[in-house]
Amino acid sequence: TSLTIEGIRLVVDAGLSRESRFDPASGLSRLETVRVSLAGARQRAGRAGRLEPGICCRLWQQAEEHGFRPRQRPEILDADLAPFCLHLAVWGARRPENLPWLDLPPRAHLAVAREQLAGLGAIAPGTEELLPTPLGRQLVKLPLPPRLACLLLRAREHGYGALAACVA
């Protein structure tokens, strides 16, 4: 995310960015520091002097750019798909792998999402289709990842809603 700030005439670009990566083995996402893409570097350079003349100082040699990716990897390839799969289930899209994707998400990520949602009780277990349960329909109404939404709802049932909100 970038924003334009008046008076900024110099951008120092280290050539790095933080990108979220989902690890299907742990079921968690983490931020990784990676080289910026060529498109990202061009966009950053445009931040200098957006409103007046400016300079972009890059902290890498131009020859290093041959190793840069042309553009950032599509986010869906590295995302936790559980929230998305829960929305698909509620919308009636039962088999995400059959949708006309621009970039097909990894099967492992879809499998982990199904497993996580079934474990929470958000979708019916033991089926390849995404069949939402009443709990799943409640979870999708909260603007949170399914695990946190489930934590809040279950804690509220036991009188610990405020504590769970602090933990979440």
Model-derived segments and spans:
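Conserved segment of the helicase C-terminal RecA-like domain
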Residues: 5-10, 14-68, 82-87, 167
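C-terminal accessory/connector segments of nucleic-acid motor ATPases
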Residues: 58-168
